[in-house]
């Protein structure tokens, strides 16, 4: 049997510098019109606005895309004056050898033009140095196409047969006939020079060296860890600044200051980098030969206290090099401490083979971590697939009720598991689903278990997904997504929330759309019918809301239209068969009550709709179109979680976490609980006690209200004071502080959170004097109970701060407005409210002072009066 021989060389054997030829730039952008030259004469200083073949300079730089670090300094083409075309034909030799390249090495190409005497970027491009499909070094010609008006985006021209044939000819794949080759090559080159592109489209032509043999990338593994200690020159742990190089940046910034203080500042480009000496010491210290010695090491009392201090740091705290070294040194001693695992992973460089292998083995023997630590491992910081799979395995032990509390954040965490983001390539945990059959099949028969045989397919998906459409490619389901899908298939309630969370977030996140398709394809007929009914209900409610909003008439006319729409559109739908409400899938509705439904006076015309359940109970909800409810949904979910945490400690503060579900980016439903605003209560009853007396009077009680009602009021006030303080809820006024007839106090409208507030000098806690008056005054026993409830609630929530902070950490990349403004700052503000650096006694004193300041504050009272005055003039 004959074998095909393939001759090639490996990149590690090539001790020659990398060369790239900048050939030419085709295309031109629209020039300035005469009117533009008159109105904006400064634009004429930019050459490309005036001349079709304006002067350009090209810079090349090699960078490692996976590790986010530069490998060389940029080098530039010389100045060449152009006439009719932009042609350089100039070889650039980069200061790096081929054997030093990594597989993720890319070329950063920047075209520079002149704005007067100053150089400015014309366009930024990048291209890989190795072919992603076969791991070979690029050879021959390559063309990069880009549009001038699409920033930082380019693509390799793959449909150019002439260029492909030229490459094959120079690589020796065609039989050479000198008399014919000369004619053919000159004709092919002339065709390439005469090709035209649409205005605004450019093509940069490059040429890589035409080596005789293909060069295959191979990374050799050195077994002796101590011999593999990098120097400053090739240290892969050093991070560099990835900003675009600007040749006009000053290297020294000088400020004169005054005669007493010097403010001379030097720019140090190495300041953010790791210290090479410390890096070298770290690698020596963690060499595999020391592992056996570390197993016997135990800390003394002082060191043990130091380790406990590190372990108790809140999530997201960055450890110093010394702290990381201490955790690593005593890793075997800490194996029984479940809280120490996340700190160990922070202290480990998972890109180092020896460290990664050892830590992953340790994880299997580590004490089982809590759910809050598992959630931390699913954040954007931990990209190693094995670590994330470990966290998913821990989540598998959580109950459906627990999973529902964290489901919103887990859906966001799925976005971190895009295949291309992982630092390791052992993607054996992924599930591959056929995208075509997923539209037709259901059940598990269409799943393909990933093994070594299809890892090649997995890699091709990640490399080809950028150039080819994802519609015909297989869907890659990460371990977390697969876990959520399987749990959602088993539990219809969980499945309903999972569907709507994906639906509301998938508009700008294509990966979530793939997960939604996979989930839908595996639903059985009954579950699919349930969700189909919910979708039809939401579509009808949206149509009703938009129809009423378009009606420019009185509220009475809108009410008539609402009654008509409910009777003709909603009632026929819910009468066919009971529908599980998306807000609460356990509630089945079978009819609608138009007589108790209404349209609110607002520019968005939200609808309050009353449904009749199969238990013959009314269910009120509000449906809005044109408002993003995802922030309110997050806040209510966190309030529900905090309520469960308090109840787990046998502390029931009578909270009212009404349900909110965003069914899209600009629409959603809200559970409507019968209530009155504090502004309305004070206007009608001149006090909260008068309102409570009307519904539940008791002549024998001191304040004239039944004891359990007043108990509800005191407890719920304490709970919401603590929670809104921690979440930094802003824009608090008497119109979004609500009270139910049985004394439950709660907040509504969470448009401003995490310290954001439209008013100046907002209070840290909203505690109106009317509430203290309803307690019986600041000297009453109810006020003392209120304070004690606050202290207990604050203490319990501080003990669970890690869980809450991890949930916010998972929402960093979400579209929540007040998180999107400053994701890191938002989490920092929540952490500050917990005051985790304080002892239990100091935290209680802090909250006592907070209550005192809120009770005695005058500015919030003035702002409330101004708000009431503004509301009066609006109505």
From Swiss-Prot:
It is a peripheral membrane protein. Autophosphorylated. Might also be phosphorylated by VPS15. Present with 1080 molecules/cell in log phase SD medium. Phosphatidylinositol 3-kinase required for cytoplasm to vacuole transport (Cvt) and autophagy as a part of the autophagy-specific VPS34 PI3-kinase complex I. This complex is essential to recruit the ATG8-phosphatidylinositol conjugate and the ATG12-ATG5 conjugate to the pre-autophagosomal structure. Also involved in endosome-to-Golgi retrograde transport as part of the VPS34 PI3-kinase complex II. Residues 728-736 are annotated as: Catalytic loop. Residues 293-526 form the PIK helical domain. Disruption phenotype: Abnormal localization of the peripheral membrane protein PIB2 to the vacuolar membrane. Decreases activation of TORC1 in response to glutamine. It catalyses: a 1,2-diacyl-sn-glycero-3-phospho-(1D-myo-inositol) + ATP = a 1,2-diacyl-sn-glycero-3-phospho-(1D-myo-inositol-3-phosphate) + ADP + H(+). This is Phosphatidylinositol 3-kinase VPS34. Belongs to the PI3/PI4-kinase family. GO terms for cellular component: cytoplasm; cytosol; endosome; endosome membrane; fungal-type vacuole membrane; Golgi membrane; membrane; nucleus-vacuole junction. Phosphatidylinositol 3-kinase activity is directly dependent on VPS15 protein kinase activity. GO terms for molecular function: 1-phosphatidylinositol-3-kinase activity; ATP binding; protein kinase activity. PROSITE patterns: C2_PI3K (PS51547), PI3_4_KINASE_1 (PS00915), PI3_4_KINASE_2 (PS00916), PI3_4_KINASE_3 (PS50290), PIK_HELICAL (PS51545). It comes from the Eukaryota. Residues 14-188 form the C2 PI3K-type domain. It comes from Saccharomyces cerevisiae (strain ATCC 204508 / S288c) (Baker's yeast). One of its GO terms (biological process) is positive regulation of transcription elongation by RNA polymerase II. Its main location: Golgi. Its EC number is 2.7.1.137. Keywords: ATP-binding, Autophagy, Endosome, Golgi apparatus, Kinase, Membrane, Nucleotide-binding, Phosphoprotein, Protein transport, Transferase, Transport. The lineage of its organism: Eukaryota, Fungi, Dikarya, Ascomycota, Saccharomycotina. It is an enzyme of class 2 (transferase). Residues 747-768 are annotated as: Activation loop. Residues 599-605 are annotated as: G-loop. PANTHER family: PHOSPHATIDYLINOSITOL 3-KINASE CATALYTIC SUBUNIT TYPE 3, PHOSPHATIDYLINOSITOL KINASE. Component of the autophagy-specific VPS34 PI3-kinase complex I composed of VPS15, VPS30, VPS34, ATG14 and ATG38, and of the VPS34 PI3-kinase complex II composed of VPS15, VPS30, VPS34 and VPS38. Interacts directly with ATG38. Interacts directly with VPS34. Residues 593-859 form the PI3K/PI4K catalytic domain.
